[in-house]
C-alpha cells in the first residue's frame, strides 16, 4: 500500500516532487522519502507510460 499522496504501479509507489533537482540531489532526496526510495528507472514501456502520465498530471495541477 502506498501513502495517500503517492501512486501505485506494479507493486511500487511513485510520487512527483517539486521543484526540479539535479540527478544527485534528486536521488538523495528520494532515498530520504521512503526506505529503499530511488529515482524511477524506465525499464519497460508500460512503466514509461505510467510515469509520463503521472508527470503530466502533476504539471497540470501546477
UniProtKB/Swiss-Prot annotation:
Gene3D superfamilies: Mannose-Binding Protein A, subunit A. The keyword Disulfide bond applies. One of its GO terms (molecular function) is toxin activity. The keyword Disulfide bond applies. Signal peptide: none annotated. It comes from Bothrops asper (Terciopelo). Snaclec that binds to von Willebrand factor (VWF) and induces its interaction with GPIbalpha (GP1BA) (via the vWF A1 domain), resulting in platelet aggregation. Intramuscular and intravenous injections in mice induce a dose-dependent drop in platelet count (thrombocytopenia). Pretreatment by intravenous injection by this protein in mice potentiates the hemorrhagic lesion in the skin provoked by the metalloproteinase BaP1 intradermally injected. This result is not observed when both BaP1 and this protein are injected simultaneously. It is found in: Secreted. PANTHER family: MANNOSE, PHOSPHOLIPASE, LECTIN RECEPTOR RELATED. GO terms for cellular component: extracellular region. Disulfide bonds join 2-13. Its main location: secreted. This is Snaclec aspercetin subunit beta. Belongs to the snaclec family.
